[in-house]
């Protein structure tokens, strides 16, 4: 059960990172105009290939962006999932810290009892 929760939290974190990455990439993406056409036919051919690749990249990027942030509800759900993931991660860390402290206190209590028993 705990491993399932960890997987869910990991998926949520990846979702948040994807939202952030797509948002940042969308605001900073700059597609060039192609280049200089002074090389004649070879230059035009390279420019056409480059333009085609850029259009393909742009369409893939836009489809990915639309899939992640295309709808306000989807974005809100993604952000809610991020909040849940962070809260779950913090709770998990808090539990681990408590367990470690409890184990240390048990070990120290056991060690003290052994010392008292040896002295007697």
UniProtKB/Swiss-Prot annotation:
Residues 100-109 have a biased composition (Basic and acidic residues). Residues 110-120 have a biased composition (Acidic residues). GO terms for cellular component: membrane; symbiont-containing vacuole membrane; transport vesicle. It is found in: Secreted; Parasitophorous vacuole lumen; Parasitophorous vacuole membrane; Cytoplasmic vesicle, Secretory vesicle. It comes from the Eukaryota. Residues 1-25 form the signal peptide. Its main location: secreted. Keywords: Cytoplasmic vesicle, Membrane, Secreted, Signal, Transmembrane, Transmembrane helix. The chain crosses the membrane at residues 76-93. Plays a role in the function of the cyst and parasitophorous vacuole membranes and therefore in host-parasite interactions. This is Dense granule protein 5. The gene is GRA5.
């Amino acid at each position: 059960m705990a491993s399932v929760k960890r997987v869910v939290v990991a998926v949520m974190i990846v979702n948040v990172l994807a939202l952030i990455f797509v948002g940042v990439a969308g605001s900073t993406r700059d597609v060039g105009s192609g280049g200089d056409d002074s090389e004649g036919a070879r230059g035009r051919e390279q420019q056409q290939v480059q333009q085609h690749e850029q259009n393909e990249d742009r369409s893939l990027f836009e489809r990915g962006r639309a899939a992640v942030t295309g709808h306000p509800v989807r974005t809100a759900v993604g952000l809610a999932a991020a909040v849940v993931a962070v809260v779950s991660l913090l709770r998990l860390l808090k539990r681990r810290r408590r367990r470690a402290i409890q184990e240390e206190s048990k070990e120290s209590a056991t060690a003290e009892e052994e010392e008292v028993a040896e002295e007697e």
